[in-house]
Amino acid sequence: MKYFVVALALVAAFACIAESKPAESEHELAEVEEENELADLEDAVWLEHLADLSDLEEARGFFGNTWKKIKGKADKIMLKKAVKIMVKKEGISKEEAQAKVDAMSKKQIRLYLLKYYGKKLFKKRPKNCDQ
């Protein structure tokens, strides 16, 4: 369960990185520099550093591809987990459970797993959490 949560957190992190906005262009940085009349050397160095971030698009491409790979592996893990849960919960054979899972969409599989783990966590909650 811990590994599943960590994997989901990593997937969310890569999704945020892949969908992030591109860095400002050098032209926009020059406008900012003119508007603010930068006299402070540290600000000028900071703006130079931002101008050197033109490789950001390449990095986003890398993370986008990595995101797709991680998402594919997470989907495979969810399929296997759903089959295991169905075998254990419903007492059916692995082949029957696999057939049921194959008939489900990815969204239905995610909802099935969330429902299962939600009930499991609800049962484990402390008694003093009732309101």
UniProtKB/Swiss-Prot annotation:
Transmembrane segments: none annotated. Residues 1-20 form the signal peptide. This is M-zodatoxin-Lt8o. One of its GO terms (molecular function) is toxin activity. Expressed by the venom gland. Keywords: Antibiotic, Antimicrobial, Cytolysis, Hemolysis, Secreted, Signal, Toxin. It is found in: Secreted. Insecticidal, cytolytic and antimicrobial peptide. Forms voltage-dependent, ion-permeable channels in membranes. At high concentration causes cell membrane lysis. Residues 21-60 form a propeptide. Its main location: secreted. GO terms for cellular component: extracellular region. It comes from the Eukaryota. The keyword Signal applies. GO terms for biological process: defense response to bacterium; killing of cells of another organism. It comes from Lachesana tarabaevi. Belongs to the cationic peptide 06 (cytoinsectotoxin) family.
